[in-house]
């Protein structure tokens, strides 16, 4: 894409962004059955952003969709806002959590009742880039029989009048479309995370075939996805999905404006929540990796990361994470899957934690 084409693309995206932010939608929509795609949006106290996010979905050229909103026990005006939108848009389904459950659970219960062939996950403060996003990606997935499709993103640091001056493009190092199939696909996502930029492990920049997504959820199991998880939740479910999918394709298509405010998880999550997410991901890596050298290195690498990142953490005052990490580490060192050398490495690292 040359500079002129890129500038025209960004201008089209800016015009669509202005519409989503500044014009209220009173149009009535009917649910067409069966929907071609499902858009899942988890909600928590998002009264300031959910209208624009919904507009970016409603204004899509692909109208044969369902929109599943999961209200994660919000205590602001989120519920009132989405109920008003549902009156005019019969494609909207609303699920209400009985307590704050987190995004992994919220997305999961929506996917399990979805009717679309493909699933798009949208954060409640994100917006689609232009009106052609869903239609273009759905058709590419359908025509090429793709299980996972990822697309380009633009990050926004604030909703402001001069927002166009604050756009920062996620530039992928891949200059062409990328296609990967099994057996390389299982570990490709994490193996290339540096080359493929920091958000490759995220769920919001991907479209996933619903049958694959549901299979991954069932493999993960209710006991796991019902845990309150506010860190590494996307990475964990993505790893399972990538392990069972047949193929993956990255498209050179700008698909989403991703909000990167100071209140996002990377800035606000307490240390114990981040640690729980990292242990959860280590557990997922062990249970869903395959018996090959690279997968073993992923497991050891995650264990070493936890040690280095949390070696001065006070586990005495965090019995939940202490017990969880102890259980996962004991599972690792007592298995035949990892070599004796790796088992000794893990044991040596965590001896001084009095965990193993």
Label each residue range with its predicted role:
Residues 1-24, 146, 312-356:
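Membrane-interface aromatic/basic loop that binds lipid-linked glycans or pyrophosphate carriers
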Residues 97-114, 124:
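Glycine-rich, basic loop-to-helix element that forms the pyrophosphate-binding segment
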Residues 179-270:
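Conserved nucleotide-sugar donor-binding catalytic segment
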Residues 119:
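Short aromatic/hydrophobic "clamp" motif used to bind/position activated sugar donors
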Residues 71-80, 99:
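A conserved acidic beta->alpha catalytic loop
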Residues 132-171:
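Conserved donor NDP-sugar-binding/catalytic core segment of glycosyltransferases
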Residues 1-56:
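N-proximal low-complexity "stem/linker" segments adjacent to membrane-targeting elements
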Residues 55-64:
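Short, acidic, metal-binding catalytic loop of nucleotide-sugar glycosyltransferases
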């Amino acid at each position: 894409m040359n500079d002129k084409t890129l500038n025209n693309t960004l201008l089209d995206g800016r015009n669509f962004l202005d519409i989503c932010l500044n014009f209220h939608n009173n149009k009535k929509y009917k649910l067409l059955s069966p929907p071609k795609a499902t858009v899942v949006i988890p909600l928590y106290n998002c009264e300031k952003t959910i209208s624009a996010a919904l507009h970016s979905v409603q204004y899509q050229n692909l109208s044969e969709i369902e929109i599943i909103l999961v209200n994660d026990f919000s205590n602001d005006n989120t519920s009132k806002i989405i109920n008003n939108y549902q009156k005019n848009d019969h494609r909207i389904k609303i699920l209400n959590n009985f307590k704050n459950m987190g995004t992994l659970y919220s997305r999961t219960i929506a996917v399990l009742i979805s009717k679309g062939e493909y699933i798009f996950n949208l954060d409640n403060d994100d917006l689609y880039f232009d009106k052609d996003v869903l239609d273009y990606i759905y058709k590419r997935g359908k025509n090429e029989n793709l299980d996972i499709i990822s697309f380009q993103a633009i990050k926004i640091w604030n909703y402001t009048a001069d927002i166009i001056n604050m756009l920062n493009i996620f530039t992928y190092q891949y200059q062409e479309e990328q296609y990967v199939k099994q057996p390389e696909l299982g570990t490709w996502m994490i193996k290339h995370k540096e080359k493929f930029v920091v958000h490759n492990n995220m769920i919001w920049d991907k479209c996933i075939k619903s049958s694959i997504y549901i299979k991954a959820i069932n493999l993960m199991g209710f006991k796991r996805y019902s845990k309150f998880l506010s860190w590494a939740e996307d990475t964990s479910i993505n790893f399972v999905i990538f392990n069972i999918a047949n193929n993956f394709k990255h498209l050179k298509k700008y698909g989403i404006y991703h909000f990167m405010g100071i209140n996002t998880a990377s800035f606000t999550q307490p240390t114990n929540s981040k640690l729980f997410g990292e242990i959860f991901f280590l557990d997922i890596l062990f249970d869903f990796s395959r018996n090959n050298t690279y997968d073993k290195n992923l497991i050891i690498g995650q264990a070493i990361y936890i040690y280095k990142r949390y070696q001065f953490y006070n586990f005495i005052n965090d019995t939940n994470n202490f017990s969880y990490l102890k259980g996962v580490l004991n599972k690792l060192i007592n298995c035949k899957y990892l070599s004796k050398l790796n088992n000794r490495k893990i044991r040596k690292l965590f001896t001084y934690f009095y965990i193993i």
